[in-house]
Amino acid sequence: MPRLEIITRAPQGQSRPFSLLFVHGSFSHAGIWDVNFLPYFATLGYTAHAVSLRGHGQSEGRSLLPWHSLGDYVADLADTVDQLGQPLVLIGHSMGGMVVQRYLRTGGTARAAVLMASVPPYGMWDSTVGMLFRDPLLVHQLGLLMTFGPGIVNIATIRRAMLSDRVPASELARYEPLFQSESQRVVIDMLTFDPFLWRPEPSLPVRVLGASDDAFLIPAQIEATARAFGTTATIFPDMAHGMMIEPDWRLVADTIADWLETL
């Protein structure tokens, strides 16, 4: 197994009976959680971890990034859970949400799961087709980002994909290091439908969250994910795909924190 970067923020005050493990989405790494979410949940008493999947952030495997599969990322999550060795709530964003779903469906264990702007259980084929109609230029630019990294596209592309117009232009430069190239293979993996793996485990507590202005997923797709898990989705208005770094990130974090209190 490759060596994986894990960022950990220790709890402040009395610690909680379970910890949190955050899994990033495509084109990103663990550092995206450390802007707001890791320190915030640490103040609430949670040990908060974030892992960079292989080829991302400071994890090993960057040279082989184009060939990493969804199965590789699921194996990374399983290895991280085993390494941490503590009761965990898994919180996955976008591709990370799909990694969490596949991990649980293939025998992985967790206290609960939160899916944020997650790839639906049935894959990304319909959202990809929708993006081709809504914003074909963005799809082309994301292809360049996937292959060559942020240096080949301007920061405005990352903003269109991940952030709302409410993020000041002066803030964009500090977010640019949070993004990187992505595996072409895993994007193909997420387009496919596996009827034997998509059905979720109904006994696991799951919270499903989405954003009204998501460039990748329309609210109906987030709601379909929630129905698959026998729950309802919360869609945050005036919010883009990068929910953890949006101006109203605290609304998302507080919604998760309130739900964690019910476990």
Model regions and ranges:
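Active-site glycine-rich loops that stabilize anionic/oxyanionic intermediates
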Residues: G25-H29, S94, S212
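The serine-hydrolase catalytic nucleophile loop
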Residues: S26-L38
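Conserved alpha/beta-hydrolase
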Residues: Y40-R62
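Conserved acidic catalytic loop of the alpha/beta-hydrolase fold
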Residues: D72-L88
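Flexible "cap/lid" loop of the alpha/beta hydrolase fold
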Residues: T109-A110, V114-L144, V186-M190
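Short beta-strand/loop motif that positions the catalytic acidic residue
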Residues: P202, V208-G210
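Conserved alpha/beta-hydrolase "acid-adjacent" motif
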Residues: A215-A224
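Catalytic active-site module of serine/aspartate enzymes centered on a nucleophile-bearing elbow/loop
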Residues: T232-L263
